[in-house]
Amino acid sequence: MASISSFGCFPQSTALAGTSSTTRCRTTVAARLADQSDDFAPLRSSGGNCGCVNNSGEFDRRKLLVSSVGLLIGALSYDSKDGDFASASQFADMPALKGKDYGKTKMKYPDYTETQSGLQYKDLRVGTGPIAKKGDKVVVDWDGYTIGYYGRIFEARNKTKGGSFEGDDKEFFKFTLGSNEVIPAFEEAVSGMALGGIRRIIVPPELGYPDNDYNKSGPRPMTFSGQRALDFVLRNQGLIDKTLLFDVELLKIVPN
């Protein structure tokens, strides 16, 4: 639910399969933006304040979080190597791209580390505690976004990132490293993290949910709306890039 204003206008993409294909592509994008205009309308209070402030004058943390993620998604679409915005075709699996690396992101972000598997990660905060390793049971807090589809959020915790963790892990996600309980990207990202760290990962489809089904491997969205948003992206064949973005905070390690 990131604000579309953070993306700015979609740049014109180069021709994919002739002029007519390019025109259809642009028309489709424009139609989608029109359909989504209500969802992405700027939030304003009756007094003209920013939508991150409620009627009582207090900051609305959820709106502030979503706005910051919107800025991130906009930044991710910027290719700093040649100074141009990435074309829309790099984020969407257009029909003209079938058979040409289907479903894989074309973007490599210079401030992220890319592993041999294709996972890209960036430590937002380096932990100072012990390192998680295979066999350990870990407790994490996580956010998830469909960066291939308007940067929509499908999971967000209502807890302040970086706050103290007092041992009550009932509402947090927990799994055992090496048990194949989670998608490969989650397993790889958490392995080697230090306790207290926060890691942002960009997940290509091949490291995501098997068979495009979030019920087969964790983490699973906890809300119906989150499940719908993720399911729509995973099951929509031929139109949407399935690249995902996760923020993972390592809260607790129970050694094997």
UniProtKB/Swiss-Prot annotation:
Q: Taxonomically, which superkingdom?
A: Eukaryota
Phosphoserine modified-residue sites:
164
Q: Where is the PPIase FKBP-type domain?
A: 135-254
**Reactions catalysed according to its record:** [protein]-peptidylproline (omega=180) = [protein]-peptidylproline (omega=0)
Q: Which Gene3D superfamilies match?
A: 3.10.50.40
For whether the record's keyword set contains Cell inner membrane, the answer is: no
**Alphabetical list of Pfam families matching this protein:** FKBP_C (PF00254)
Q: Which GO terms describe its cellular component?
A: chloroplast; chloroplast thylakoid lumen; chloroplast thylakoid membrane; thylakoid; thylakoid lumen
Localization annotation? Plastid, Chloroplast thylakoid lumen
Which Gene Ontology molecular-function terms are recorded? peptidyl-prolyl cis-trans isomerase activity
Q: Where is the transit peptide?
A: 1-29, 30-88
Protein EC: 5.2.1.8
* Keyword terms, alphabetized: Chloroplast, Isomerase, Phosphoprotein, Plastid, Rotamase, Thylakoid, Transit peptide
**Function of this protein?**
PPIases accelerate the folding of proteins. It catalyzes the cis-trans isomerization of proline imidic peptide bonds in oligopeptides.
The family line of this record is: Belongs to the FKBP-type PPIase family.
**Name under which the protein is recorded:** Peptidyl-prolyl cis-trans isomerase FKBP19, chloroplastic
The primary gene name is: FKBP19
